[in-house]
């Protein structure tokens, strides 16, 4: 067994993952508000944090989206950001456990 497998399968780590996903889902409303208020700096910060943290939880796709959100926020491209936020929401929701 790979040490990474052991780490990612740890019940305590799985609990942290679920808490992080819940945090991201709760952040989605604020992210959308920042988009429609064209607060590109807050979106850039969100993307930067997502890029840095999501990968540590094994969410490479979310991490890559965070990097794109960070970069595109700097260019203030509203339409592209809107698409990236939609991609983020879809990617996040497919990772949420069924209720």
Task: Please identify what each model-predicted range represents.
Residues 1-99:
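Two-component system phosphorelay core
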């Amino acid at each position: 067994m790979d040490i990474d497998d052991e780490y990612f399968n740890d019940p305590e780590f799985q609990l942290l993952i679920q808490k992080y996903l819940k945090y991201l889902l709760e952040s989605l409303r604020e992210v959308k508000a920042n988009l429609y208020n064209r607060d590109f700096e807050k979106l850039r910060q969100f993307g930067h944090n997502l890029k840095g943290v999501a990968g540590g939880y094994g969410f490479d796709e979310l991490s890559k989206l965070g990097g794109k959100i960070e970069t595109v926020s700097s260019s203030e491209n509203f339409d592209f950001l809107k698409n990236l936020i939609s991609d983020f929401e879809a990617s996040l929701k497919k990772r949420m456990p069924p209720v």
